[in-house]
Amino acid sequence: MKIIHAADLHLGSKIEAKLKDISEERKAEVRNSFLRLAKYAHENDIHVVLLSGDVFDSDRPFKKDKDTFYNVIKQYPDIDFLYLRGNHDTEEKNEDVYPNLKTFSEEWRTYSYGNVDITGLELGPNNSTSFYSTLSLNPEHINIVMLHGTLSDSVGLEKIKLSNLKNKNIDYLALGDIHSFEDGEIDKRGHYAYSGCLEGRGFDETGEKGFVLLDINEDKLSYSFHPFCERIIREINVDVSSLNNIPSIIAKVEKEVSFNSKDIYRINLIGDVPFDS
């Protein structure tokens, strides 16, 4: 059994650029990322997609962003989408019922697929300190837990204290909130991972973006990061010390940077140059 873990799509987020058409093109690419994800799942016989929070960028998403999301849900009835709301889309609700859209609340809820249990909870003021003690998992099953928040050494709103989840029979903790892939160990049994976002939206979200692919074979679970972004946002420093004219600086940049025509770049010129150059 294979499962996709994604998060932080942030459909409808503001993307600014000096040229409006470029901004709109990038917004469309971010919006299209969820459709590409669902298509990938369908073509690769993956029937469960985890969405660990912040599908939308706000509690009141634009109609075109809601339509994009829910149309994909309808388009792929063979895929179960497990949608856990995050801190950006806490109030998002949909009046229509889609059998393949599975949601969560502020109490633990479990969806089972054979011996694989997927358990999730949406963090809020009423459960931010108590949810650790109320988590109960079957030790004989493969347990995937979904949460949206930031790992912390303390408990509190939108915080997840990893040490409080040790020895809870978690095999994989599917997290959202951090926009780059990050993973680590919970205890001898389980691991956690932030999938990161599907598409970088600015120069604070550089590098490869994508999702985590889980592979479950009998009683063993493995996972790997799967790059999936349409474009990579890159920020690169080029040392131009001692260069005293524009042509030589351009030549240095072209020598040191391997440009991909699809990617987005910010080149920072660093170093010491003569004052009169």
Give the location of each predicted region.
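Amphipathic, non-transmembrane alpha-helical secondary structure
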Residues: 31, 35-42, 67-70, 132-135, ...
